């Protein structure tokens, strides 16, 4: 995708809204409705189904996005024993959730269709429907979560909302409300990956 848009809006919106696109594709093809663990992990039954990565190339003087590479990796056919013991506790696959195989080409085609719709919405500035659906699917909202910093520190907070820039609005134990951004912290449930 050659977006020619500002880095902050394009990269962040695309990364998080692509998670919505993946959820839509899985729902349409497989009949199951994934949730989203903030910031961009599609989940089923409290376990990670998919990983999403973004790579940006910026124009030097204007910091406008020249290229945006989308990386989406879905666990399609893994059985529990295919995962390492550590990953087995937090990951799942479509075959585990459905009990039968899923056509990879059909899933890839459905994801491409949804990403095409996303790119058209992004170009038209129509972010509202993706943000609303993201909020609806976000499994963290209304729950107490652990905010883990890259340095190993962290704190607990109540996840309240997703702001217009896809930041996670939280209430700390002292009552202070703040917004955390992707890259600043990672989020885990108190008792597992999402719970």
How should each PLM-predicted stretch be described?
Residues 1-6:
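Interfacial segments of multi-pass membrane proteins
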Residues 37:
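Gly/Ser-rich oxyanion-binding loop with an adjacent helix/lid
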Residues 7-9, 16-34, 44-195:
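Long, positively charged amphipathic alpha-helical accessory segments at protein N-termini or as interdomain linkers
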């Amino acid at each position: 995708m050659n977006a020619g848009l500002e880095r902050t809006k394009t990269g962040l919106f695309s990364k998080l809204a692509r998670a919505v696109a993946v959820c839509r594709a899985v729902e349409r093809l497989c009949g199951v409705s994934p949730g989203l663990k903030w910031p961009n992990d599609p989940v089923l039954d409290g376990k990670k189904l998919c990983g999403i990565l973004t790579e940006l190339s910026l124009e030097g003087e204007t910091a406008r996005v020249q290229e945006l590479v989308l990386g989406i990796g879905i666990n399609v056919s893994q059985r529990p024993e295919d995962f390492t013991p550590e990953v087995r506790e937090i990951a799942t696959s479509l075959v585990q959730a459905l009990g039968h195989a899923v056509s990879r080409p059909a899933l890839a085609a459905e994801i491409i269709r949804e990403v095409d719709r996303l790119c058209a919405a992004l170009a038209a500035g129509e972010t509202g429907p993706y943000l609303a659906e993201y909020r609806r699917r976000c499994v963290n909202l209304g729950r107490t979560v652990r905010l883990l910093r890259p340095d190993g520190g962290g704190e607990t907070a109540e996840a309240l909302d997703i702001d217009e820039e896809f930041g996670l609005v939280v209430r700390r134990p002292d009552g202070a409300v703040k917004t955390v951004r992707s890259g600043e912290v990672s989020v885990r449930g108190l008792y597992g990956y999402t719970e």
